[in-house]
Amino acid sequence: QWLHGTPARNLKAEVTATLNSTAAAFKDYENYDFTDPVRKFSEVELPILKDKSLDNSGKLSFNQKLDLSNKAPGMLKATFLTKVFEGGGDFSVDVFSKTIAPYAHFTGIKAPEPHKYDAYFTDEDVNFDLVSLTENGKPAPNRKLEVQLFKMEWRWWYSRGYDNLS
């Protein structure tokens, strides 16, 4: 709508989305980590709509499936930039963000308090809590999970490589 209330009908519009990784927590599970530290995700900008027109009431609906090829480490934040072009070429801009769940289920891990220097001793049992949730944060019971535990080796900062998760 224009500022005076009439519909902005039949104007050209375009929408782009910028995706970033976010550490969004689920309600009641704020102490759990739902991010995969092995997956790297760089900011990506996607064209969503280009050269589409608003209808007679000044609206435009769209549904877009984002193919991320299972590269997202967890929840994503999508920032949408919309532009609506006037007949003379000027445009109005709107920006809004939404959290996007790239997966139907998420597994979270809650680590116990570590010892000094954020370490766990290898000669004692350490219990981690796991939870499986739907994309809406509801418990997803009876899901089979495969869990692997890795011992991290300490390195000097200058000998760090991509094979080092710490």
What are these regions (language model features)?
Residues 1-166:
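A structural signal for beta-strand and strand-to-loop patches characteristic of beta-rich domains
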